[in-house]
């Protein structure tokens, strides 16, 4: 049976999802705040993150639940919305890979989200190269790249 996944930015919607489709995989599409950590690990399996303090708190909450919480680490590529700076990637990932109850699914960026400027091929290539660098450095597969909302779709379809 194929896994169903639902992405949302509201934890209240995941409360409903747990009742209606308890086996569906939940992707929390907002960087969790300190007060939402317990709910994020209780209601979702995957979240987007860019702060080591938040990821450490998710690790502790996941440990208490006896689960591995999956994350996509967001990288800042010019939209100035969220994400770690590319120069910090190696140190950041090294710290995250030390956390036993966190699994890293991949990297992401919010391209074209706030500025309204369409993302470029160069930005997509940067994400691909950062993933390759991290996979080679840490010998860990990062299967997913999240490049943003539907604004990225035309660009990705042209260049796949």
Show where each model-derived region lies.
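N-terminal active-site wall of soluble small-molecule enzyme domains
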Residues: 1-44
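Active-site loop/helix belt of alpha/beta enzymes
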Residues: 1, 61, 69-70, 76-157
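Active-site-adjacent beta->alpha loops and helix N-cap segments on the catalytic face
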Residues: 14, 56-61, 65, 118
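Short beta->alpha connector loops
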Residues: 11-12, 32-34, 52-54, 149-153
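Short, charged, surface-exposed secondary-structure boundary motifs
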Residues: 36-40, 57-61, 82-84
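Active-site beta->alpha loop and helix N-cap motifs at the rims of alpha/beta catalytic domains
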Residues: 39-44, 48-55
